[in-house]
Amino acid sequence: MLALKPSGRLARWSILVLGLALTSCDALDDLISVEAPSRVAAEDLDNPANAGLLVGSAINDFRCALTHFIGAGAYIGTEWGVGGDTGGGSYVWYDARVFTPGGWTAMYATGDCSGDAPNVYEPLSTARWMADDALRRLDEWGDAQVPDRTELTAKAAAFSGYSLTLLGEAMCGAALDQGPELSPAEIFALAENRFTRAIEAAGSAGATDIGNLARVGRARVRLNLGQKAEAAADAAQVPEGFAYEFDYSGADASTENKLYVLMQRELMATVEEPYRNMAFQGQPDPRVEAVDLGLQGPGTDIDMWAAAKYPTIESPVAVATWEEAQLIMAEAALDAGQLQSAVDIFNVLHDRVGLPAFSSNDPAEIKDQLIYERRAELFLEGQHMQDIERFNLPLVPAPGTPFYHGGVYGDQICFPLPEVEYLNNPNISR
């Protein structure tokens, strides 16, 4: 059964992804396998009784897109390398950091959520459109027609916000609903607006978990926009222990944990060396545990390592956590010159996992430690690619370095606006 699992300070619980009152796991599985809304009759979409289904479908689309996004970013950054011989597949282009708007290296844009490779543009665009379409319909319907309209509005706005956030982090530019090309900053501004709406609606509906999810999301986009004080203000409201996760299942390709699939079933992704034996002051960091599978990638001599974080096809994946919020606060404190506050946050996180304390009053050392903490705490959670951009981290291997599968490494850390937009969008031209 697929579920969303928000966690509070003292409790952990699951809610049904479609937000409907179902009486059996089979009923939920049937609904998760429902036809894509694009193939559902228009009169069904316009029926207020289906509001929960529409919002749940949008959330389901985002759940699938999330692991695709994380995988793509892991290849582009230093978390993953390609394990097997893909015959020129898109995995290679991700790892080599070489993309073009069209052709074979544009599979990031043309593949859907059921594809083998981690696709980005179409899955995230679909999730965003579904959430915004649900929002539009909820605005047209009244509370009498949809008794839980306010809570559904909070959910739709929150996942529209997250879809936009990941689009802004992944893409060099993107278009929405055949509109003009938007820069990442413009996309982040739209995401901030959606999160604000989600926070307000969640407050009115008493949906604490969705409100905290949206606060972490708004803090994330505000950090991306350079609004660190505002980001910290949001993050400070997130309670200790909060986590919002998706569960996955082996029901079909769209419900699988793609990270597990690529590392352990297909052997197409291997944890890169910097993460295989990550340690702080000589002590292994339990937040980043990599397992030597004792195998080599298909058709290669590349050693295969997998993240212990995702041991099965059902392994949950975090969308937002208290730990992420704390690191946002630490970054804002460092930016404001409150060095000890940042250090204190690191040490709270260290204490929770049994690591030695960090100590420094040197801003450069504290910044380096912040980068380390984000690498460890947010390992394979979809944050690394944007951190490369925000912190201007060196690309490893460096551009121009010979690539195992031929050619050399490139320097692209975002995906270009795809050719499909130039061909089909009247508001975009070359």
What are these regions (language model features)?
Residues L166-L176, G206, N224-Q227, G337:
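Short coil/turn linking the two alpha-helices of tandem helical-hairpin repeats
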Residues C25-T78, V396-R430:
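Membrane-proximal, proline-rich intrinsically disordered regions
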Residues G52, Y91-A170, R197-A205, I313-V317, ...:
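Conserved, well-structured interaction surfaces
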Residues Y91, T100, T105, E192, ...:
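Hydrophobic-face positions in mid-chain alpha helices that act as interaction patches
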